[in-house]
């Protein structure tokens, strides 16, 4: 019985997975278009920053994007397969040697820069 329930849950989750998510990782600069509802109107809001973490868990996958806005660091966690995310565009590939870039939180200015990956 438990196996049947697992198969049903897996089928439902597979149905909701997005297929148009590009391949990106920590260190990449991305632009996330988020659907924002204000009253009766719905519009797209762009959030551009560096991916500092990525969590791969199927339907529950998420990624954290960090940007500097008016001299203040802003981080936002996005659910990869959320219906509120319209699109994710990779602007720049970063050459990093870590999976999680939490050390960027303590850095500012030139020391917070990431080298571009040369292909």
UniProtKB/Swiss-Prot annotation:
Keywords (A to Z) from UniProt: Ribonucleoprotein, Ribosomal protein
Listed GO CC annotations: cytosolic large ribosomal subunit
Superkingdom of the organism of origin: Bacteria
Gene3D superfamilies xref list: 2.30.30.790
One GO MF term: structural constituent of ribosome
GO terms under biological process: translation
A matching Pfam family: Ribosomal_L19
Protein transport among keywords: no
PANTHER family with a match to the protein in the record: LARGE RIBOSOMAL SUBUNIT PROTEIN BL19M, RIBOSOMAL PROTEIN L19
Summary of the function given for this chain in its UniProt record: This protein is located at the 30S-50S ribosomal subunit interface and may play a role in the structure and function of the aminoacyl-tRNA binding site.
Xref: NCBIfam families: rplS_bact
Stated family: Belongs to the bacterial ribosomal protein bL19 family.
Name of the molecule in the record: Large ribosomal subunit protein bL19
